[in-house]
Every structure is written in C-alpha cells, then in structure tokens.
Amino acid sequence: MACPQLPPLLLLVLVVLLKAGVNYNTPFTDIVTSENSMETSPVSSLISSPFAHSTHSSGEPPKSYSSTMSLETDSITHLSPSSSGATPTIQPSPSSTDSRMIPSSPQPETITHPSSGSPSAELTPSSHSTLPSSESLTPHWSPTSHSPGTEPLTSTDQTLEPPGPAPGDTGPRELHRNPSVVVVVCLLVSLLLIGSVVMAVRFCHRNESKFENLDEVSMGSVNDRLSFAHHLQE
C-alpha cells in the first residue's frame, strides 16, 4: 500500500514546488521591470536634455527618440516563459542596443563642442582686435609728445622772456645804484677839497705886511693925512 501511494505524493510535492517557483518568479519580474523603468527614465532625460540644448543653440528642430526608448523597454521587459520554474532571462534586442549606443556618446559631443567653443572663438578675435587698436594708438601719441616742432617753441619762449631778477635778489638793483652813488660821493669830495684850498690861501695872505702896497698909494692922500695929524698934535 505504501509503495503505490508514493508517486502521487511526489507529484503533489512537485506541484507545490512549481507553484512556489512561479510565485517567486513573478515579484522578480516586477522588480526587474521597475528597475529598468527607473534606469530608462534618467537615460531618456539625459538624452533629451543635450539634444534640446543643441536644437536651441543650432536652431535645428528637436528629434524624437520615443521609438528607441520603447524598443529598449520592450527588450528589457521581454522574458522567456518557462513552465519548469527556471529563472527568467533578459534578452535585449540588437536593434535597441545599436539605437542606444548611437545617440548616447557621439551626438552630444559633436553638438556641445561647437556650442561651448563658439563664445571662445568669438571672444578671441575681439580681444586680438582690441590689442592692435591700443598698440596703434600708442605710436600716434608718442611722436606728438616728443616731436621736434615743440622744442624750438620752448627755446623761442625762453629767448623772449626777459632776464628779470628774482623777487628776493637785490644784486642787479645795487649795481644800477652804485654808479650814481659814486658820482655823488666824488662831487662832494671835490667840493670839500676846493673849499679847503681856498681857506688855506686866504689864511696865508692875512700874514703879509701892508708896506708892500705903498707904491700904489698917492702922495696927496699921504699929505692930507699928515696935515690932519699935525692939527691934532697942536
């Protein structure tokens, strides 16, 4: 009795195990699909953002990648059905991988590089163009500041200016006054000398006797004086 009952029990155990395996596989497939959807959403945002930026910068119309994204999600969620309870296998299609690899790396690089390099290319000629303008201005100013035409003007101005004395210097004025002072002093000295000579001559003539002048006196005047002297004596 026990021997013929063993196969049905084994069959029941196998059925239970198969059901448990199917129940175990279903949450695994749900987890895989949720993870794939989470992975595809940032990938789609990253792919759409550089292309949107490139379309704004270059002026080209935006391209839709909904078909490639749908192929990716379909290839990720595609599971091989198995009745024996084996683990599900993910079979991505080659078209989805090709479509994933083509727009991901080369296109953003080719689009972002000109957009980032364009301001530098526009700025560099402007900076180079401003430098020659400043350099071209400097030689125009340098000859005018050191031109030889201005030097004779300064020399003529210096020659036209009178050599007037400084406000604190009194040397030239004294030189102009000294000749007049010398002349006045010489005149005073000469007058004093002449006066002294005249006074000396007069003083010398006072000591002379009056008898030397008798020859010049008339005899009649002498007789009159003598008669008058006789009358006085009597």
Swiss-Prot record:
Regions crossing the membrane: 181-201
Membrane association type: Single-pass type I membrane protein
Secretion signal span: 1-24
Localization, UniProt: Membrane
UniProt KW tRNA-binding keyword: no
Region spans: Disordered: 41-174
Ranges annotated as biased composition (Low complexity): 122-140
Any one of the GO CC terms: membrane
UniProt keyword annotation of Membrane present: yes
Keywords for the protein's UniProt record, in alphabetical order: Membrane, Signal, Transmembrane, Transmembrane helix
Biased composition (Polar residues): 41-121, 141-159
Membrane side Extracellular: residue ranges: 25-180
Name the UniProt record assigns to this protein: Protein CIST1
Lineage of the organism: Eukaryota, Metazoa, Chordata, Craniata, Vertebrata
